[in-house]
Amino acid sequence: MRFFALFIYRPVATILIAAAITLCGILGFRLLPVAPLPQVDFPVIMVSASLPGASPETMASSVATPLERSLGRIAGVNEMTSSSSLGSTRIILEFNFDRDINGAARDVQAAINAAQSLLPGGMPSRPTYRKANPSDAPIMILTLTSESWSQGKLYDFASTQLAQTIAQIDGVGDVDVGGSSLPAVRVGLNPQALFNQGVSLDEVREAIDSANVRRPQGAIEDSVHRWQIQTNDELKTAAEYQPLIIHYNNGAAVRLGDVASVTDSVQDVRNAGMTNAKPAILLMIRKLPEANIIQTVDGIRAKLPELRAMIPAAIDLQIAQDRSPTIRASLQEVEETLAISVALVILVVFLFLRSGRATLIPAVAVPVSLIGTFAAMYLCGFSLNNLSLMALTIATGFVVDDAIVVLENIARHLEAGMKPLQAALQGTREVGFTVISMSLSLVAVFLPLLLMGGLPGRLLREFAVTLSVAIGISLVVSLTLTPMMCGWMLKSSKPRTQPRKRGVGRLLVALQQGYGTSLKWVLNHTRLVGVVFLGTVALNIWLYIAIPKTFFPEQDTGVLMGGIQADQSISFQAMRGKLQDFMKIIRDDPAVNNVTGFTGGSRVNSGMMFITLKPRGERKETAQQIIDRLRVKLAKEPGARLFLMAVQDIRVGGRQANASYQYTLLSDSLPALREWEPKIRKALSALPQLADVNSDQQDNGAEMNLIYDRDTMSRLGIDVQAANSLLNNTFGQRQISTIYQPMNQYKVVMEVDPRYTQDISALEKMFVINRDGKAIPLSYFAQWRPANAPLSVNHQGLSAASTIAFNLPTGTSLSQATEAINRTMTQLGVPSTVRGSFSGTAQVFQQTMNSQLILIVAAIATVYIVLEILYESYVHPLTILSTLPSASVGALLALELFNAPFSLIALIGIMLLIGIVKKNAIMMVDFALEAQRSGGLTPEQAIFQACLLRFRPIMMTTLAALFGALPLVLSGGDGSELRQPLGITIVGGLVMSQLLTLYTTPVVYLFFDRLRLRFSRKNSKPVVEI
């Protein structure tokens, strides 16, 4: 009593406390960062190594394996995968959530250093690492185009100057430059001219390397001066290399230009990048795992004027893709939804109370509670994101509940003629325990979420804490500011036996009377209600098993990512044509705004595309509908496939796959894996629950297998090293020398001119100079035959791995897809030497599915314990929790009605319903117990009176929660995929629970009361003295 009186009779102090809470909240709101979702990125580090010309199998055994053995010893590694292709190896290390990315980077560097002695010689550089996930979609893509600059010069400028500057911006983890390669001097040899002059390829290589050196020459000094010695020991352009003497034939000088075409070109001519049908250099910017995407993008945009000032006038720098506009639009939609929810909730209160003054009280209490929450969010290091703002939207219905319960009870005393301050004190005292019980039991629902580990726990933590803080502040405001305002703003009225019957008041009285009549009938037919109650429990179980499930709602971020997979024997020239064809098909779609793409490098038969869609307001279709439409057109392109997927704000794992979900096959036997992977992929491709099934196992690339006759080689004076060097010099784009420039280092690349290597007959023109100086054709000591070879070799851990990626057809859930895959694997009878498991998002989904029921049970158990403590009873908490089955049935039925799968967002809705619907029972049970204790009523009379007296606040709180969630259901625009499942779950659960719990709760109350009395009689037998 004294506690409440302290705030009621000291209005100035109470107002100042509320003002302080509001001001702190406003300050916190201004300081909070903005993000699409809470920070849930796994720390990921990518290690890269190269050995030009080495086959995928050579890269896997000689480069990847030694690095994996060393990197695998690092503490906190959650998953290690690698992919080796022609001349390149990439190892992805995914660490646990609690691993600091900088500390992990130091361990990675130490592991690379430890493995250095085990790596092969000839590597142009040491392995390097980057603190970024290559499977993540870039947060921004910049393009460079020019009418006068070559692609090589553009690439050089982009990688040497622009990429370095962008990488220094806070939050940027990696700047990947694609579309070409660094400038180089390319030497294209004429094998016939070399043969005529008697010059070997190794002789050319050694001559070039010896002619281009950079060594210290020292200095000359006398007693007065000092002269630094400088020589023309470097050759920097093609024109300087052409006259280089490489051999003397009968006293005549043979110059490089006589036997080769020497041009200023690029290191790797098998690269191409495009933007909207124009050749372009792409700068693909990815953020650090712990960085905020909006802050990082803002930092890049702020740097753009400086970048544009750096570039020459002949270069055009454009933003081809930016992830931030849709994120900002989504957050703006949530903020508007929050404002609408607050307005609707206040409208509900006004319709019930029919008083401007009375409505003003919750109209003040709700904003104070919500705004004050921002201060706590800032102190906790949270952000303004879709989930935290949705928590505040839902909290609107919660925080007004506390104010409604207090206000309605005070208003009841005022209507009975009590003075305002006395009514405020008496009314608050009566419902103080009820409000505390409601709030604490609601917060208790989220305790299991706060203790939940893994990605789901990280994802939901901000939601749970934000909502709990809002409820806590609301509890304080409802017991301090609300009664104070009631006592000083509301006026007492003359006692009247019947309320005024106007408008909503008349409807409410009619509803209350009808409810009273129906409740009497129900209390006389309790067995029928019991059957209905048990039926809802059974229906819950059936619906939960039957409803389709997924991990997270499929988002429409306005960005698509596509992976091209062509025939494994395709040439680079043909692959570049496929890229252009696919880009034209996509660019012609009316919903597409921008298309960029690239191909080449170590994976000639693959490419990547990034598509920016028009804003949601300018297109009718969702991203998935656009993908379905494009899939039909793209399927007509022969010799290649383009797999499209919508970019999501959550992507798990470091695998770069051509679809959203992955199923990984592991084996310690590479032949077994290569035998079973095609069978499994074929079976999965036939499943209607899967779409775009593809695999990263590519072992059907064309290979020319050369077989040396070692006896003949020995007789001819040729060793294997000389023969291999011939092949590397001829076909390997061998980097034979380095050109040092002030801003960068460039290579001299030697190969046989591609004009002479158009087909297999080129091997017949190759020759080796033996120990006697004679030219021996390759065909004298080698035979060749075509064969198949892998284009890539993949590992997970130290096991051979192959990942089958897939998308979901429209109308199919992830649970249906995973069940179909597991069923197919069982039917195929895959041997134990080949193990299959889901990876990435599909793996997290399965882990979440296993913990969902445990989480719900834990939430119910926590609420039960809290209610036990508050009521000092084992029975009454069960009465209160009996409201839950009807709410969950309503939620699951609503999801089925709207064809929405049960996702992590729907799980949040179920958890919220556990907290919402029990409020009705708490209000009934509290008043019934008080009526039995103080009024001397029977249980039947007490619960009947409690139901009628609390009918108005129950209707008000339920409708407030319902209208608070309704804007989530009706919301459209960006981010609605996240909001709608939450709104559907809550609205469906509230409607069903309101229809049933008004009747089931009093029946359950009486059942447990009779049960309690029965046990009391059994335990009250007279004691017989012995």
From Swiss-Prot:
GO terms for molecular function: xenobiotic transmembrane transporter activity. Keywords: Cell inner membrane, Cell membrane, Membrane, Transmembrane, Transmembrane helix, Transport. It is found in: Cell inner membrane. It is a multi-pass membrane protein. Its main location: membrane. It comes from the Bacteria. One of its GO terms (cellular component) is plasma membrane. The chain crosses the membrane at residues 15-35, 333-353, 360-380, 387-407, 431-451, 463-483, 528-548, 853-873, 897-917, 953-973, 984-1004. Belongs to the resistance-nodulation-cell division (RND) (TC 2.A.6) family. MdtC subfamily. NCBIfam families: PRK10614.1, RND_permease_2. PANTHER family: MULTIDRUG RESISTANCE PROTEIN MDTC (PTHR32063:SF34), PTHR32063. Part of a tripartite efflux system composed of MdtA, MdtB and MdtC. MdtC forms a heteromultimer with MdtB. This is Multidrug resistance protein MdtC. It comes from Salmonella paratyphi A (strain ATCC 9150 / SARB42). The lineage of its organism: Bacteria, Pseudomonadati, Pseudomonadota, Gammaproteobacteria, Enterobacterales.
